[in-house]
Structure formats: C-alpha cells, structure tokens
Amino acid sequence: IAGSTGAININVLWEMGGAQRILHGILEQTKGLVTGVTCGAGMPYKLSEIAAQYGVYYLPIISSARAFRALWKRAYHKVPEWLGAVVYEDPWLAGGHNGLSNAEDPTKPEDPYPRVKALRDTMRQEGIPDELPIVMAGGVWYLRDWENWIDNPELGQIAFQYGTRPLLTQ
C-alpha cells in the first residue's frame, strides 16, 4: 500500500518518562516501517529533530495557535519539510489532558472553529501552505457536524480523526 515508505504512524505521549529514549529506540528498530510520529501530552519541542533524524514526519498534537507558535519558533521551523500535519485536540471536546489558558473557563466550552482558524492563520504567517492538513481530533462523531469545515478557504486542508466514545464515564 505505502510503496517504499512506511505505512505506520505511531503516537507517543511526550510527558511519559523516557519518551525521547523510547522514540529513538522505536524509530531505530523499525526503519522503513514508520512514516510518522504523532506526539502530544506536553510540548514536544524535540519531536521535529528526532523525526528528521530518522526521515519520518512529525505530527504535533496541540490545543491552540499559541502552543503551535511556541513549538514552531523554538524548533519546528528548522525542519519544516518533515511536518506532516498539525493535530488539533480541542480542550473541551477531546480527552481532558489538553491545555487551557488561565483566561479560559473549563466549564464553558467554546466553539472550536475560531481556535482552528487562528491556528491556520498562525501557520500561514509562518509560511506553512494550506495544503498541510490540520487534523481535527476529539469530539468528532459524525462528519455531518463538520461539513462547513470541508473545502473552507478560511481553514485550508482539514482532516478528521475519529475515535471511540467512552463506554464508561462518571
């Protein structure tokens, strides 16, 4: 299916103990199998450097344009060719470990559209083309709920990550 490139994308929790060592080990032992690394749960500044070292794409998971800008300015701008996508996990719709600023109320969900538009605007300011997708993750259950995001020039290329709903909650 993937031809001469890998067909596997792995997900690593950045704040997990030993994440960098584990990531190096996985990528060293799976050369040619892994094509991308999705990484969140923290600010994975070194993700781009590690991914580029092994010739795989990096897909950071972020919850705001501000977080992406910090990652881009500090590290990601050095290897933009390996940025595969930006995964946006909404602080209110996705699983609960996403960052909110002190000005945001966790009990008052906000519409994700303005936040994703702000992310795209930031990406454009940094010279990242609209063809590089933003992946909307968390709270995506039905495509019909997101139809106005598809082929929307304000947002550029958009993809959707579907997950499973929690079976047991309090």
Feature roles, as predicted:
Residues 1-129:
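Active-site entrance/lid segments in N-terminal catalytic domains of soluble metabolic enzymes
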Residues 21-32, 140-154:
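Short, electropositive alpha-helical surface patch
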Residues 42-43, 90-92, 97-99, 142-170:
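Glycine-rich phosphate-binding active-site loops on the catalytic face of alpha/beta enzymes
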Residues 131-142, 161:
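Glycine-rich anion-binding loop/nest that anchors nucleotide
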